[in-house]
Structures are given as C-alpha cells and as structure tokens.
Amino acid sequence: MFDNYSRESYIFNAGSLGHIKGLTITSHGSPAVHYFGGLPYALPPVGQWRFRVPRRLPKDYRYGTATEPGKFTDGTKICPQPPSSNTPDPSVVSEDCLQLNIWVPAGPPPIHGWPVCFYIHGGFLQVGTSNTKPEDLVSLLNESAFRAIMVLPSYRLNVFGFLASKALAAEASSNGEATGNYGLWDQRLALEWTHENIRLFGGDRSNITVAGYSAGAYSTFQQLAHELFRVPEEKAIIRRVAMFSNSTGVMPKSLQDQQLQCDELLRRLGINLDLSYDEKLASLRAVPHDRLVQAQIGMRISEFRVLADDAFYPLDLMDKINNGEFAKRMKIRGIRLMNGECESEHIMYCRWRTPQESYSAVYQRLLADFSPEVTQKIMEHYCGSSENLPVGYKNWEEFFGRVYANIQVHYLQRGFHNALFTGGLEAGRDVFRYRFERRLDCVAEKIPSEWGVTHLTDIPVWLWGCGYTNGLDDQEKKWLKGWNEGFAVFVNGDEVNWGTKNPKDMRRWRRDGKTDVCEDNSWEDGLKFWKLVNSGHRGTEGKAND
C-alpha cells in the first residue's frame, strides 16, 4: 500500500507559532496530507514537575523561525511504560512526552476550515503511543469520504500519569493545584492547545470531535464529563464524541484506596514509609524513570487509574448520569455520541495481566482496577457466596476476560445508553450505537484470526486501514463505504443516516459482510449490571485534597 506514497519536506508558516518543518505525503505523485509530528503542547513534566498537573507553554513560545524552522518530521516522545505487545523503542521514550501529532488534508480547506478529530490512543492508561507512520492516515484522509484534521496527543501513563497519594494531595493543595489524574489533565491541555491553535493549520476550532479507542474512549468520556460539569458552556470545546470499545467505567478509587497502591510502590522502591511527605516526594522524584517502570512490573495493585478527586472527576458523576442531568447537558450543548463494541472483546481482554487460575487471583486482579466495594459487588454478582468457577466458563482466565469486557465495554455501555435515552437523547439522532461481527482480512497481520472479532480489530475500519500494510481490499471498501461515510458526516457535524431508531437498535456489520440494524439481545443484562455497580453513589466520599 505504501509503494504509492512518498515523503517531501514541507516548510509551514504557522503564524504566531512560528515556522515549522513537517512532511507532505504524496500519493501517486499528488500531495495527499501534511504531517507535523512531536509538537509540544505543554512544558516538560520532569524533575520537580513529575507528578504535578501540566503547565501551559508561555504565550510567546515559538516552534521555529523563518531562517531556522523547527523540525517536526518524526513523532512524539512516548511516556515510559512497562513492556506490552507494542513496547516502544527506548530511543523515543521520555518523560518529556507532552507533545502531539497533526495530519492535515492537502489542498484548500472548506470555508469555515477543516473539521477536527482529536483522537486519544488506548492502552489501559498504562501503555500505548500516539505515533503511527505519517503515511498511515493517507487512506483515511485522501482516499475515503473522511476529510478532517487529525490530532493525536501523547499523555502521561501508568505511574507517571495516575499516581495519587496523601503526600501528593497535600503538596497540590499547598500549590493551589489538583492532584492525581495527571494524564487526564494532559489530555485536556492538549485539547485546549488544539482549540486555541488549530485555525493556524486550517482547522475549524468550533467543530472539534473528541474520539478514542479503549482507554482512549474511556478518556474521551472523562473529557466530556469534565467539560459538562466543570467547564462553563461558553468555554466548551467538544462538539461530539466517538467512544470506540469502552464506556464510562465505574466510580474511580478514592484517595484512601490509591494510597495503598502508592505504599506498595514505595516499598518496592525501598523508600521508607515513615518519611515525611516532603521526603517521600523528593525520593520519588529522584528515582530514574526506568526504575519507576521496572517497579510497576509484578505489583499486586498493578493498574494506575483515575482518582475520584472532584476536580477533574466529579464525585457525583454517576448520580448525574442516572438522574438525567448528563443527558440534559449533552442535549443543551448539542453533543452527540457514537459508541459500540466488537462481538468478542473478551478474547483480547483476558490476555491483559491475566490472573492465575483461582477465585482469589481474579478477585485480587479486579482490585487492581476497581475499589473494594465495586470488586465485591462484581464477584458476588457472578459467583454468589461460592468461590467456585461459575457454570458456563471454561476456566478462570476466560471468566476474567468476559467479566472485564462486560465492565469495560458491553454492560456499562448499555447502562450508560439507557440513562441517556431516559434523559431525553434520541437513538439515531443523538446516540449512534454499533456492533461488529466481522473483521478485516488485514487484521491477521497483528491479531491471530482465531481470536475472532475481538478488541482492537475494528480500528482499521474507523481509520481506514491505519497501521496495516495491506489495508482494506476492494470488497471490504464496498461493504464499509456506508460506515466510512457515516463517520465522516458525524465528524463534519452533519446529520447522520445511521439507521437506528430505538434504544435497543444497533447498526451491525455482519459476518456475511452486509450491514443491517439488529436488536440488542444483551440490553437487559447491561441494565442490571449498571444498576449494580453504578447506582446509589452519594458523591460524598471526600475530595482528594481533604
């Protein structure tokens, strides 16, 4: 597929940002897209700024001059992270990773500018990258119906992005800052940078979609929730959201829960728990980043996640969803949602830090992600008072994968959608549900065919072959033409002909390649599970800085 593409140097006058050197990717000899990689959107979060909210660039910050344009032809630096199926090369790993990549369609923009898709990468909030080859988005932006500027930010992950403790909270309080959720604050600052500067690249700052896959979809939800309840409407940025294969999650852990994780980390690093707050933080900030990564491997509380802080994450958020206020605010602001699933999400999920073959191992593994209260509810829901493997599961590994997939995707999506519909949003007009029961042939390049239509397999549907050597074949392009056009229209802000009319309706790509609308046969199970884990919150667990 890349044989038809070539790279050319591209010097661009970015107005008040200065002059920058990017790339023009040509297709069959004609300019297709312009690419700029690794543009900083915040000051480096290093040294004393490790484990603190991101800092804006100075107003007079310039990326380069006419005589010495800044070189942005590669990608972003990548946050240090534990090994995974896509472990980054050490040469691009750095805590100084608050940068973003931009793809701009070649040619003159529309009258009001290109629509903008701000796309957040996934990876459980622990791993991942916003980098992909500059050529990877040519098919989407030049050879499909989709025309928009793509902005892919890097943000802090794992311990660097989501460590929380009483010591950090005390320091943040004394500095007048928020604590925890640094990765979410990074994303927000990148979104604000985009809103403030994208017009310089030909973008329409009033037409921004936030999208993401997996943890990127969860992050997308967090960005929407934060904006609905913590940002005045006149300062709102988000026009619509696309959440691919994830949902709202459950009420995040409290500071007390997160403190247990921090204590475990300190012990693994050999830092005395009896030290003063200041001494603990000085010791933590003195640890080299590679040692902080190594210390995470094998932790019992392995997942560094969102903190229920009431600054970024409203403590009463689940109540606001359940009582219709979330839907009401979406309706008032005209925000629409695209959200759905792959049929076998669990096949991939059961391979992420898989627990051993026992009830207690699964229980402990879920505790790494969720609060003790939520974990207990989940295990009692499936296992009752017994500690035996429930009927219908081959082993504990499969059980974990299916339960994790229901929490991350299947069941909580349905509960969320139900609350939105009950709150006044309309199927096929405000909320666009979908389901994939087939995958592209090219996906076998990275994901075994026997894993089926599992998590991640639909990314090249939405991004039109991105990241895969062969991309879509001609038959697949015909089958998925309507999906591509629907996504393009959605991001453009126009009316989408999705085909769904009722809350239970899902647009579906079937095994035979055809598209239809089916009735959701897991709707009631999802509502029951949502009520179990996401109702009854009082929103009074206490602020993070208390």
From Swiss-Prot:
Induction: Expression is induced in response to 2-benzoxasolinone (BOA) exposure. It catalyses: a carboxylic ester + H2O = an alcohol + a carboxylate + H(+). Disruption phenotype: Does not affect tolerance to 2-benzoxazolinone (BOA). Belongs to the type-B carboxylesterase/lipase family. Residues 72-91 are annotated as: Disordered. Carboxylic ester hydrolase; part of the Fusarium detoxification of benzoxazolinone cluster 2 (FDB2) involved in the degradation of benzoxazolinones produced by the host plant. Maize, wheat, and rye produce the 2 benzoxazinone phytoanticipins 2,4-dihy-droxy-7-methoxy-1,4-benzoxazin-3-one (DIMBOA) and 2,4-dihydroxy-1,4-benzoxazin-3-one (DIBOA) that, due to their inherent instability once released, spontaneously degrade to the more stable corresponding benzoxazolinones, 6-methoxy-2-benzoxazolinone (MBOA) and 2-benzoxazolinone (BOA), respectively. The active site is at residue 214. Its EC number is 3.1.1.1. GO terms for molecular function: carboxylesterase activity. Keywords: Hydrolase. Fusarium verticillioides possesses 2 unlinked loci, FDB1 and FDB2, necessary for detoxification of antimicrobial compounds produced by maize, including 2-benzoxazolinone (BOA). The FDB2 cluster arose as a duplication of the FDB1 cluster with rearrangement and expansion by incorporating additional genes. It holds the Pfam family COesterase. This is Carboxylic ester hydrolase FVEG_12634. PANTHER family: CARBOXYLIC ESTER HYDROLASE.
